[in-house]
Amino acid sequence: FMEIYKKQTLSETFSVYFEKRMARILLLGIISGFPWVLIGSSLSLWLKEDGLSRSTIGWAGLIFAVYAFNYLWAPIIDRIRIPWLTNKIGHRRGWIVTMQIVILISLVCWSFINPTANLALVISIGLIIAIASATQDITVDALRIEQVGEDEGKSMQAGAAMAVVGWWTGYKLGGVIALNAAEFFQQAGFENYWQITFLVLGVVVIACNIGLMFVHEPQPTERQKSQIRTDQMIEEKLGASNVATKSVAWISGTVAGPIISFFKKNGFKIALGILGFVFLFKIGEAFLGRMSIIFYKEIGFSKSDIALYSKGLGWITTVVFTLLGGLFAIRSGVIKAMFVSGILMASTNLLFSVLAWSGKSEWLFAVAVIFDDMAAAFATVAFVAFISMLVDRTYTATQYALLASIGTAGRTTLAASSGAMVDWLNGDWGIFFVITAIMVIPSLICLWFIKDKLSLQ
């Protein structure tokens, strides 16, 4: 279908972004991205300003590892219904609202705690937010993919772009709200300014849930029928039909079905190649992202500077280049988009080395942030489109969660050592950013070997 897209004018290709369902996908992205503000930059800066070390903050980021394992409970989320809520607002939305309530309660708990005296409790609540966020992502991604028909490749890539725009909107604008609120309350003389900020962020969570009620949820009949057929097939192979065999069939169909389907569709070697690429692709970007706000603070930028350049300016750049990245993926193909974005990610990380070696410079900070966000936007939209096109609709939630989790595993578990790496380099931020640039190369080698054999819809 690539030839058809290339014959279209740019305005015809771009028109897909103005469909109603793209606005719904945008909101789902915002809901998914916002919790990262809470356990990312907000938590990091809260701990930093309470006097905790870079290494401690880096290791605290291990709570993000939860995102790497949400595929383990994705099959259950795909099947189990939330009492009352599922009947009222649908299966997917019922799960999202439940997890949003958990996040809201966690924010209220944070607002009563001093991190220096209760570090373990602060991190534990952060972990609860991460688990709730990772769980809602399973249904958010499934609901997003189900907004688009299975044979609509163009709309799937545009939907991926809108989801990424939404995610970064939730993350960047959420960051603008968090940083400016914290600075406002700090300057107003409140000692517990971060705790008050978390209550403000709770209002954003409530607003997102109101918006969610306008997102259409398709009837899950086909998915359920297909899952029942898989259960029956396993039950027949087990022989006698009783409670035990029905339970084994349900568990096997729930857990093994999605994995068998993935390997069957792609073949064993290609499936392993896909998993290797997904694991490695964004490791360098994660190392940079985990420590970036600490780096900005250490070279002399204030919270309002970071809010303006990294969050505000970064958000505008991300939105523009995500939409352009979506167009590039539609017109040039998702594989080419992956290669281009990988090279861009590595190149832009080097700009932070220049900033580290030259010292505090607002214009250089702005340039580094713009180009880094441009590369991250291209990379993320290509990556989301890539794994969205690999999933089987029978197991949408589970397969997407599995692929996204493997990508997150590389980024979260390994990137937790980012603070320790900076300490090991004696605070040489320049060398640290050079190392993050080199980290993308293994994933591109993986992609090169499997690119001609991929089964993309």
Language model features with spans:
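Intracellular loop-helix junctions on the cytosolic face of multi-pass helical membrane proteins
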Residues: 2-19, 105, 111-123, 135, ...
